[in-house]
């Protein structure tokens, strides 16, 4: 073949040979350039995708920190920090779903989107539980204050009378109410489940004392006793409301913790997978460039 090509070229003029040679060099140069450019573009694209996925990983970690801060401060700083990060991550995952081509990796992104949806729902539930908890706190203060005020009126009136026994009984009731408030405060400040029942028992003791005083006390004091009893019953209901909000908040936090772990796990898995894709594309581009170079050298020898 080489001899045949040499004979053919021997019949071609020098200018034509130079033109053919220059054209061949130009074609081979363009081939190498195109191969290199295509490979480089692919690697850059994969690198950009990997960088974008890494930014989502960072957002996921920021979301966890913001959620922990929200829990620690009991929502004092508001919900904007967590909600903003949820919005950013949701938008980022939608973009990632469009950027990623591999079916398995698309499935991973869908799992992240599902986890984020459940995370968002759980956070909303936790916020609502927090609002109910603070509402219960407010009721606790108002109802207890009203009960104390009504009993104090009775106590002051009896202090001016002659019945020491009745006065001491009302003083005992005041002490029971104060004991109930002490137990309830211990429960609400600690949030410990085991502190709830002692608080309820203390309230029940005060309610029983009011019932016991209904007959011995004169008729004029029974309206105050009745109002104090109603306030203590509302006080007890507020303790139960506080408990329910605590249970709801704990359940929401558990879900958020689980979904947050899924988000981080899938994000790491996606990063690893896309790194492999990038490295594979880089190796493929390198092989294409080597092939184009080898072809150029082969034509050059010919």
Predicted regions and their residues:
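Selective recognition of signaling/oligomerization transmembrane alpha-helices
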Residues: 20-24, 35, 164-212, 237, ...
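Short, charged, amphipathic alpha-helical segments
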Residues: 79-87, 106-114, 134-142, 167, ...
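Extracytoplasmic
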Residues: 92, 135-171, 209-211, 215, ...
């Amino acid at each position: 073949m080489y001899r045949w090509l040499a004979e053919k070229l021997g019949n071609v003029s020098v200018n034509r040979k130079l033109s053919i040679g220059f054209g061949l060099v130009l074609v081979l140069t363009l081939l190498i350039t195109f191969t290199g450019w295509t490979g480089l573009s692919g690697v850059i694209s994969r690198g950009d995708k990997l960088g974008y996925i890494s930014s989502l990983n960072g957002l996921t970690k920021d979301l966890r920190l913001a959620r922990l801060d929200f829990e620690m401060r009991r929502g004092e700083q508001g919900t904007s920090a967590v909600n903003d990060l949820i919005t950013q991550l949701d938008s980022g995952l939608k973009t990632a779903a469009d950027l990623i081509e591999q079916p398995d990796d698309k499935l991973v992104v869908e799992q992240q989107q599902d986890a984020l949806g459940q995370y968002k729902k759980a956070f909303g539930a936790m916020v609502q539980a927090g609002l109910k908890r603070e509402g219960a706190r407010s009721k606790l203060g108002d109802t207890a204050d009203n009960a104390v005020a009504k009993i104090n009126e009775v106590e002051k009136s009896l202090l001016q009378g002659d019945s020491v026994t009745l006065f001491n009984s009302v003083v005992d009731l005041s002490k029971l109410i104060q004991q109930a408030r002490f137990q309830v405060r211990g429960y609400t400040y600690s949030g410990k489940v085991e502190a709830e029942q002692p608080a309820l028992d203390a309230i029940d003791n005060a309610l029983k004392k009011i019932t016991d005083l209904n007959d011995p006390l004169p008729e004029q004091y029974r309206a105050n006793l009745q109002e104090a009893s109603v306030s203590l019953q509302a006080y007890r209901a507020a303790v139960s409301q506080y408990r329910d909000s605590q249970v709801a908040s704990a359940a929401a936090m558990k879900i958020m913790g689980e979904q947050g772990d899924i988000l981080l796990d899938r994000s790491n898995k996606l990063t690893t997978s896309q790194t492999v894709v990038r490295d594979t594309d880089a190796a493929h581009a390198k092989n294409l460039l080597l092939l184009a170079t080898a072809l150029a050298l082969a034509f050059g020898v010919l």
